[in-house]
Swiss-Prot record:
Protein's GO biological process: L-histidine biosynthetic process
Protein name: Phosphoribosyl-AMP cyclohydrolase
Cofactor list: Mg(2+); Zn(2+)
NCBIfam families per the UniProt record, alphabetical: PRK00051.1 (NF000768)
Keyword Membrane recorded: no
Provenance organism: Pseudomonas aeruginosa (strain UCBPP-PA14)
InterPro entries documented for this protein: PRA-CH, PRib_AMP_CycHydrolase_dom, PRib_AMP_CycHydrolase_sf
Keywords: Amino-acid biosynthesis, Cytoplasm, Histidine biosynthesis, Hydrolase, Magnesium, Metal-binding, Zinc
Phylogenetic classification of the source organism: Bacteria, Pseudomonadati, Pseudomonadota, Gammaproteobacteria, Pseudomonadales
Catalytic activity: 1-(5-phospho-beta-D-ribosyl)-5'-AMP + H2O = 1-(5-phospho-beta-D-ribosyl)-5-[(5-phospho-beta-D-ribosylamino)methylideneamino]imidazole-4-carboxamide
UniProt-recorded Gene Ontology molecular function terms: magnesium ion binding; phosphoribosyl-AMP cyclohydrolase activity; zinc ion binding
Family that this chain belongs to: Belongs to the PRA-CH family.
Amino acid sequence: MKDWLDEIHWNADGLVPAIAQDHETGRVLMMAWMNREALALTASENRAIYWSRSRGKLWRKGEESGHVQKLHELRLDCDADVVILMVEQVGGIACHTGRESCFYRVFENGAWKTIDPVLKDPDAIYEHAGHHHE
C-alpha cells in the first residue's frame, strides 16, 4: 500500500508549501514549508510543525512564542503539491510581528499598506527566547 506521504509532489528540495488557515474564519494566517518529517509529525502530533529553511531544522510553531497551531484538518490540493492546514491559532497571533496573520499588507494605490494592528509587541512575545524568530 502506498504511503500517504508518497502521494505528495515534493519540490526539488524535498519541500511542500504549507498554508495555515483559521479553521473557523478561513482567514489565511501564514505560509511556510514542510519536509516529509515535518508533515508526518504535524499529522501525528495534531499541531503545525514546519521546516525552517533559514535554520535548516524543524520549526515547531509556537515553541518560542507559545502561539501553537492546533491541527483540525489537513488538505492536499489537486496537483498534490500544496497542503493546507486548518488550525486553531492559540493566542490569536500567527505572525512574528505580533499580528493575527502574516498577510497584513494590502496593495493600494501602487504601494503596500499595513492594515492589521499589532496585537502584541514582538519583543514581549520573544523576550524569553533571547532572539528574534523568523
